[in-house]
Amino acid sequence: MWFEILPGLAIMGVCLVIPGVSTAYIHKFTNGGKEKRVARVQYQWYLMERDRRISGVNRYYVSKGLENID
């Protein structure tokens, strides 16, 4: 019957979801608790470079508040 395919479909779905979820958690763990930023356009790259300069430790994912900006 048609429902015999459901277990295989569920297993295949889980196997397709695991890499995406695990990648997000790995990036979050390695980037100080924040998800990885992707610069798809040049403006986003400029923002990441600005955040890197402002952070003071040369990493874009270390955030500083407005009180630390000169």
UniProtKB/Swiss-Prot annotation:
Subcellular localization is given as: Mitochondrion inner membrane
The membrane topology of this protein is:
Single-pass membrane protein
Cysteine-cysteine disulfides = none
Which InterPro entries does its entry note? NADH_Ub_cplx-1_asu_su-1
- Pfam families reported in the protein's UniProt record: MWFE
Keywords for the protein's UniProt record, in alphabetical order = Electron transport, Membrane, Mitochondrion, Mitochondrion inner membrane, Respiratory chain, Transmembrane, Transmembrane helix, Transport
Top-level taxonomic group: Eukaryota
Q: What is its main location?
A: mitochondrion
The GO cellular component terms are: mitochondrial inner membrane; mitochondrion; respiratory chain complex I
Which one GO biological process term can you cite for this protein? proton motive force-driven mitochondrial ATP synthesis
Membrane-crossing residue ranges in chain numbering: 1-21
The UniProt subunit note reads as follows: Complex I is composed of 45 different subunits.
Q: What role is this protein assigned? A: Accessory subunit of the mitochondrial membrane respiratory chain NADH dehydrogenase (Complex I), that is believed not to be involved in catalysis. Complex I functions in the transfer of electrons from NADH to the respiratory chain. The immediate electron acceptor for the enzyme is believed to be ubiquinone.
Family, according to the entry, reads as follows:
Belongs to the complex I NDUFA1 subunit family.
Q: What is this protein called?
A: NADH dehydrogenase [ubiquinone] 1 alpha subcomplex subunit 1
Originating species: Mus musculus (Mouse)
- Upper lineage ranks? Eukaryota, Metazoa, Chordata, Craniata, Vertebrata
